[in-house]
Amino acid sequence: MFIVDVIKKEDATGELKSLYKMIEHSLGFVPPHFELFASIDIEAMKEFAQYNFKMMSHAKIDKNLLPFLRLEIAKRECRSYCISFNTQMVTKLMDGEKLPSDASQKLLLEKVLKSLYETKTFTKDDLNSLEKSGISNRDFYDLLSYASNFMAKSKMIEVYLKKEA
C-alpha cells in the first residue's frame, strides 16, 4: 500500500503499541495511514491523534460532519486513498445518510468549503450567517483548521502511496 515499511498494529511494541490501542479504542480500528504516520514520526502521530480526538468531541461541531468534510475535500483534491477511506467512513458511521440533519451543521460545512475553494468571495457576511445559526467564529475557525490540516495530511498520504507502474 505504501512505499515505505510501516509497523502494523499487530507488530507494535512499547509506546507505539499503546498509541495504537488508544486509536483502536476511539475509532474501533487503526487506519493504515495512521500506521504510516506513526511509523515515520510517533510524536507527530500522537499530536495528530489527540487533535482528531479533540475535534470528535467538539462542543459545537457534530463529529459525524467530519468524514463528510474530509470526503468532499478528498474529491476536490483528487486524493484517491482518502476518497476510498472516507467513503467507507461515511457509509459506516452514517449508515448511508447524506449529512447530519442539523441546519447549522450543513451551513458550517458549506461555509468551510466556500472559505477553502472560493476564498475571494468569502466575507464577513458568511461569518455573520454562521453566527446567526449559533456557530461562533471560533467554531468556524476550528473546523477550517481541521480541514486545512486534512488537506496537508491527505497530500502526505498520496506521496507515500505505492503507484501503479
Model-inferred region functions:
Residues 1-165:
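Hydrophobic alpha-helical segments
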